[in-house]
Each structure stands twice: as structure tokens, then as C-alpha cells.
Amino acid sequence: MNLQHHFLIAMPALQDPIFRRSVVYICEHNQDGAMGIIVNKPLENLQIEGILEKLKITPEPRDSAIRLDKAVMLGGPLAEDRGFILHTPPSRFASSIRISDNTVITTSRDVLETLGTQQQPSDVLVALGYASWDKGQLEQELLDNAWLTAPADLNILFKTPIAERWREAAKLIGIDILTMPGVAGHA
């Protein structure tokens, strides 16, 4: 089972404050573990324009049609001071890894320098921090009914309003997560 380019959808019983009602986009999953970015937990009072200001990046030439007031996500509990940018191709940046045909993750400053200009990727999600699982840990959490999984959907990843992503991700597999009981049993 490889869950790269899939969503992890927190089950209603998962009460960890960081992962409660979260949708995690899995960037890498292999025999050594998994790494992902939470895509529906906005950081309070932090937008993309705020990140650019802190890093003293001024979009040149600025395209006023491109909004920089999108929320920055809490990507996970690890390395919360590091930026991770999920975006659509191209992956012409210094530190980019292609996750799927339509999704790239970049950690280098050069992608930030394109934000707000015509050179920015068409779809962008900026996060601080990431989530990871050791070898076998994610698989055990799946057996413990902590998560649902669904193939990733770019519309949910980039365009669905943040507050609706948890429910919409579950709908990908035909589940209305808001009607599920708090604890699912094993069959």
C-alpha cells in the first residue's frame, strides 16, 4: 500500500488537537515511513503576504489579480519554522520534488519569490511544519481506525474552502463524515 498523493482524513474519534478533523496530504510514503502536510488547519492571523513581508520578499512585478491573503496552514507538528509549498507544476525551483503528475512540493525560497507575480504556479498552498510517521506507524494508525484514506483531489487541495475540506475529502469515498459516530468498530 502506497499512500503518496492521497489524503488521510481524520476519523471523528481522533481527538489529538493538531490532527482533530484534519486532512493530511501525503507527500511521501515508503517502507521507511510517511511524510505529509495538513491542508485544512490555518495558522491564526498569518497569510501568504505576511510570510513574504517577514522574509523581505516583494513580488516584482506585482500582479494585483493574484491574491496573497490566503491563509498559511499549520502543516504539522514538526519543523514548524520551515516552509513547505504545495503547488501545481512546473517544478523549476531549486528544491522541488514531484509528488504526482499534478502536484509538487518545494522548500526553497525561489518559489516564494514568484508568489504574487505571473511566474507563480497556478495553484499554491503554503504551510509551516509537516507531519511524519515512522516505519509501520501510519499502517498501525490505519488499523486502529484513526484515519480514512482517499486519492488526493486537486480541487479539494487548492480550491475548496478550508473549513469544508475535511467533509469534502471524506465525500470522495462516499462518506458523510459529519454523520459518523465518534468511534468506529472493527468488523
Swiss-Prot record:
Gene Ontology CC entries for this record: cytosol
Pfam families per record: DUF179 (PF02622)
Superkingdom of this protein's organism: Bacteria
Family indicated by similarity: Belongs to the UPF0301 (AlgH) family.
Protein name per UniProt: UPF0301 protein YqgE
